[in-house]
Amino acid sequence: MSAPRTLYDKIWDDHLVDSQDDGTCLLYIDRHLVHEVTSPQAFEGLRMTGRKVRAPEKTLAVVDHNVPTSPDRHLGIKNEESRIQVEALATNAAEFGVQYYSASDKRQGIVHIIGPEQGFTLPGMTIVCGDSHTSTHGAFGSLAHGIGTSEVEHVLATQTLIQKKAKNMLVRVDGQLPAGVTAKDIILAIIGEIGTAGGTGYVIEYAGEAIRALSMEGRMTICNMSIEGGARAGLIAPDETTFEYIKGKPRSPTGEALEQAIAYWKTLQTDEGAHYDRVVVLDAAALPPIVSWGSSPEDVVSVQGIVPNPDEIQDENKRTSKWRALDYMGLKPGTPMTEINIDRVFIGSCTNGRIEDLRAVAKVVEGKTVASTVDAMIVPGSGLVKEQAEAEGLDKIFKAAGFDWREPGCSMCLAMNDDRLKPGERCASTSNRNFEGRQGFKGRTHLVSPAMAAAAAIAGHFVDIREWN
C-alpha cells in the first residue's frame, strides 16, 4: 500500500515524465497561458531554431500588461516598446497557431482572470505562464506557477518543464470570518504571519473551514498572493464549489466527459495522514480588516492598528529595512492607520478584479460620493467581467459615486501602462504588491480588500469597514 499523499504530491506524480538522481524532474504541462511581456523572445527562439508550438490547443494568448484601460484605447498604444510587444504577440499567435484575445475581443482581460472564466483552467492540471501570479489558478486544485522567458520557450516547444519538487506546507484557516473580513484579509494575514520568505521552497495548500466557505473568486484571491508569501504555488482542493463554477464555461467539459472529470477531481484531496513539512494555523474569527503600511506585503496591521516602530525589531538588517520602508512611505511610527489620508484608489488586478469584488465595492459606495481629494478608478479584470457588471448596473453606481470606470487590463497594479501613480501619491490598492515604485516612480501603495479600498475612496482616508455606514 502506498504512503498517504498530499494534493501537491498527487498532481506532481500524475505529471512526472522523468526524474534524475539529483532531484531534477521533467513535468508534463497541461496548460500554457501567454501574454505580451514575457513571450516575444520565446517565440523568436522557436523561429530561429525552426521549431513549432508543440500543443497550440493547450496554449492561450492574451494582451493585458501593456494595454491602455482608457475608453479611447482603440486609438492605439502611445509607448513604443509596449506597442511593439502587443503587436508581436498578435503576429506570433497567428504564425504559430495559438488562440489569441486582442484588446478588441470581449474575452480579453488579465491572463489569470480569463483562464478560469473560459474553462481553460481545470482541477488536477499543471498550468504555467510567464507571470508570477500564475499561482492564482491553484484555487482550482491545479499546480500553477510562473516561469521565466527561457522556460516559456521550452514549454512552447516541448509541453514540458524541468523542475525540482518543492516541500509541502499546510496553511489551515479555522472557524468563520467576521463580517467585513474577506479573502484578501486572510492572505494578507497569512503573509504577515509567515513573512515574504516564509513559503520559500514550499507549495502551500490552503485548507480549513474559512477557506472552504470562500467562493471561487475568494479562493483565487488567496492563491494569487501565494507568491508574495514566498511560495512556489498555492493549492486549494476542489469541491462542489469548484465543480459548479466550472460547469458551463466555454472550454469546460460537458455531458459524460464532465461526469468523468468530476469523478477524477474528487480524488484530488490530501490523504489522511499525509506529511506536511510545515503547518501554519490561523483563527478566522480573530482576523480584522488589514492594511499594509510598508513596502513589502508582510508589512501589515489591522486597520485599527498603528504604524509600527522599527526600533522594536531585534534584527538589525530587518530594522534598517523597515525604517527605509517608513521613510519611503512618508509615515511615522505610532500613526493610527485610520488617520492616513490617500490620494488615489485602484480597484482591480488579478487579485481583486472579478465580479464578486465589484459587487462588494458597489455595496459600499452606492449613494455616496468619492472624496474631493481622491482620484478613484475601477478596472474590471476582463471584458466579460465588465459586461456582467454593466448588466447588473454596477457601472452606473460607480460613475454616480465619482469613480472612473475603465476597460480591462492589468492597469495600475504595475507601472507598465498609462495608469500609474505620480511621485509621492498615496494609493489604497486591491492589487498584490506594494514594492517601491511598483505603481509608479516614488508612488506609495497600501494593499487592502475591495470593500476597504471603496470605503477609503469615500472617506478620503482608511476606515474600518466593520464600522462603515
Curated annotation (Swiss-Prot):
- EC assignment: the record states 4.2.1.33
Q: In which pathway does it act?
A: Amino-acid biosynthesis; L-leucine biosynthesis; L-leucine from 3-methyl-2-oxobutanoate: step 2/4
Which coenzymes or cofactors are required?
A: [4Fe-4S] cluster
Q: Which InterPro entries match?
A: 3-IsopropMal_deHydase_lsu (IPR004430), Acnase/IPM_dHydase_lsu_aba_1/3 (IPR015931), Acoase/IPM_deHydtase_lsu_aba (IPR001030), Aconitase_4Fe-4S_BS (IPR018136), Aconitase_4Fe-4S_dom (IPR036008), IPM_dehydratase_rel_enz (IPR050067), IPMI_cat (IPR033941)
Binding-site list for [4Fe-4S] cluster: C350, C410, C413
> Which residues are in coiled coils?
none
Keyword set, alphabetical order: 4Fe-4S, Amino-acid biosynthesis, Branched-chain amino acid biosynthesis, Iron, Iron-sulfur, Leucine biosynthesis, Lyase, Metal-binding
- Family the UniProt entry places it in: Belongs to the aconitase/IPM isomerase family. LeuC type 1 subfamily.
The entry describes its oligomerization and partners as: Heterodimer of LeuC and LeuD.
Q: Which HAMAP family match?
A: LeuC_type1
Please identify the protein, giving its name as recorded: 3-isopropylmalate dehydratase large subunit
